[in-house]
Amino acid sequence: MRPLAVHHVSINVADVDAALDFYTGVLGLEQRPDRPDFPMGGAWLDAGGQQVHLIEGTPPPGLGQHFALLVEDLDDTITELRREGIEVSDPRPVGRSRQAFVADPSGNAIELHEAGAA
């Protein structure tokens, strides 16, 4: 098997409207208009050409399940989010990269990832 790419990441959220406000209003993702008419609530988002699917359901606990958003400048991103009242972990090095975490309104962990020198 040779996958071409990751098509989407699906995340369970307790409140679709609150999650949609957070992901679009705070994290800057854009809502996609092409979500099929599924029986469960949800929304499709675009994150730099990658899809993030919000699905109404119970989110799992902990940091083990998360996805990462690549950011250009982690310090600027943390400052901007904290200025908006969003709780963000302090940055920490991971190899040549750096990361910090935020949580959406349902408690899902989102890694903010700044790539290091190759």
What do the predicted segments below correspond to?
Residues 10-50:
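Core segments of cupin and vicinal oxygen chelate
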Residues 21-22, 80, 106:
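Structural preference for long, well-ordered alpha-helical segments within the folded cores
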Residues 37-41, 62-63, 94-98:
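Short acidic/glycine-enriched loop/turn segments that link adjacent beta-strands
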